From Swiss-Prot:
Manganese-independent peroxidase that is able to convert a large number of compounds, but its physiological substrate is not known. In addition to classic peroxidase substrates (e.g. 2,6-dimethoxyphenol), oxidizes dyes such as Reactive Blue 5. Also degrades beta-carotene. This is Dye-decolorizing peroxidase msp1. GO terms for biological process: carotene catabolic process. It is found in: Secreted.
Length: 513
């Protein structure tokens, strides 16, 4: 464990136990906005107002001025850049982090009101090797984070090796990531240039990924066409009880934030880590043309349905929701956009009456990733909840790709999801979901198969041999025992890393000292 001087140690303790007002920074004199930088798809649970969050956090003892803004806000950005970097001059980086970068970091409290939102929101997170580069060797009690994603990508995440990974993610050179979000890419690029100027050559760019909400009525939808982020849990101390939507899980803050109530290692983490969160990043390429072709080729044959409607039904059963976001557990054969837009109803289901798969297949993506009533209810497995905060990247499918039913090999046309998930324990959160539920052929019933949407062929046979078609059951409502063989991965991992998103006070008193 790193030894600090007496003065530094005193500063850490003083900051940790200081009142909430001690963390409130002087107002930033930079221009403020008149319209929100956050998106608000009606299907997703709304954010609390600043006043509501202040009341909820006060009763739970959360300090929203000290928690980085992306952690609890979730998937509500229009443009977001992920800038991955390596620290080449630790002394300069630490000095600039404390003197200049810290005032740019956006807190949760700042994001909740337009009047306090910056033109571009900025968050920062560090890998295990990044913390070590800053001289931080304290044990955060998360061995998955400590080892890095490269160590468990094959064994736990079902990546068939790193052949498809972005080169920058192969190795330990990624020390950190800046997350920059705004309503225009120009704003994002301006703030990035400002950060690079401030850091004065103390970092080197490893990789960058520009995320962007899809246009028009596809805002909030990923590239397969389905709405994302509907099932994010409510966090006690952030979401007021009156704003919790039917079917939405309520979890203790320690499931997301280190050192808070119900954190598995609440009393074992270093004090400065309180109110930080582990950020899982995965660049997930989506083969949208191939997915759509698969639906066309295997369209379900249902009475009074056209082939196109049968393809839409198959897609809905693979995902567990229609493209409008209406859940098939509530409307199993026809889409219901009115239901989808009603956030009082669109998440209010639990699979508990569906034992024959006529409504929702056991293998459906949303059932694999969030089994709800299959395991006793949404609040019966709180440790397995994560907050997803990702965003699509890449252009819309081109006419040429539609015509060929094949994704272009042009790197500029790659599209997918910049997957981001927060939790206080990566093993209990993201890794558990991926390994024990999504990629487990016998969850939650024997013979279910892997997740047909994001599962990979390499794991289906129990080996890591690639190109082994995965077999999924239950997708045909007329014959639950029938199986469909899926010979292509619709989602391809391009790599990623595990990061720690520290509190603002930790940046000030530990990481920049």
């Amino acid at each position: 464990m790193k030894l600090f001087s007496a003065s530094v140690f005193a500063a850490i303790i003083a900051s940790h136990y200081a009142s909430a007002t001690a963390h409130i920074r002087a107002p930033n004199v930079k221009p403020r906005r008149t319209n929100s930088l956050l998106t608000a798809p009606p299907q997703q649970p709304p954010l609390p107002s600043a006043q509501q969050a202040a009341s909820a956090s006060s009763s739970a003892g959360l300090n929203l001025t000290d928690i980085q803004g992306d952690i609890l806000i979730g998937m509500k950005k229009n443009k977001e850049l992920f800038f991955f970097f390596s620290i080449t001059d630790a002394a300069t980086f630490k000095a600039k982090l404390g003197s200049d970068i810290l005032e740019l970091i956006t807190s949760t409290n700042q994001l909740l009101a337009v009047a306090t939102q910056p033109i571009t929101a900025v968050n920062v997170a560090f890998s295990s090797t990044g913390l070590k580069a800053l001289g931080i060797t304290d044990d955060l009690k998360d061995p998955v984070f400590e080892a890095g994603m490269l160590s468990n990508a094959v064994s736990d995440l079902s990546d068939p090796g790193t052949g498809n990974w972005v080169p920058g993610f192969v190795g330990t050179s990624v020390h950190g990531v800046f997350l920059l979000a705004s309503d225009t890419i120009d704003n994002v690029n301006t703030e990035l240039a400002n950060i690079q100027t401030i850091l004065n050559g103390s970092i080197t760019e490893i990789h960058r990924l520009q995320g962007e909400a899809r246009p028009g009525d596809q805002q909030g939808h990923e590239h397969f066409g389905f709405m994302d982020g509907i099932s994010n849990p409510a966090v006690d101390g952030f979401t007021p009880p009156a704003e919790i939507r039917p079917g939405q899980a309520l979890i203790p803050p320690g499931i997301m934030l280190l050192g808070e109530a119900n954190d598995t290692f609440q009393n074992d983490r270093p004090p400065w880590a309180k109110d930080g969160s582990f950020l899982v990043f995965r660049q997930m390429q989506q083969r949208a043309p191939e997915f759509n072709k698969f639906l066309q080729d295997h369209a379900l044959n249902m009475p009074n349905m056209t082939s196109e409607q049968g393809a839409d039904l198959l897609g809905a059963r693979i995902v567990g929701r229609w493209k409008s976001d209406a859940p098939i557990d509530l409307t199993p054969l026809v889409d219901d956009p009115v239901l989808a837009a009603d956030n009082q109803r669109n998440n209010n289901f639990d699979f508990s009456d569906a034992t024959n798969q006529t409504r929702c297949p056991f293998s459906a993506h949303i059932r694999k990733a969030n089994p709800r009533g299959d395991l006793g209810g949404i609040n019966k497995f709180p440790n397995q909840h994560i907050i997803r905060a990702g965003i699509p990247y890449g252009p819309e499918v081109t006419d040429a790709e539609k015509a060929s039913n094949s994704s272009s090999t042009d790197p500029s046309l790659e599209r997918g999801l910049a997957f981001v998930a927060y939790q206080s324990n990566i093993q209990n959160g993201f890794v558990f979901l991926q390994k024990n539920w999504v990629d487990n052929t016998n969850f939650f019933r024997p013979g279910t198969g892997v997740d047909p949407l994001i599962g990979t062929n390499s794991r289906n046979s129990g080996t890591d041999a690639p190109n082994t078609p995965r077999v999924v059951s239950g997708l045909d409502p007329n014959n639950a025992t029938s199986t469909i063989e899926i010979g292509i991965d619709f989602v391809v991992s391009r790599g990623g890393e595990y990061f720690f998103s520290p509190s603002l006070s930790a940046i000030r008193t530990v990481l920049s000292v």
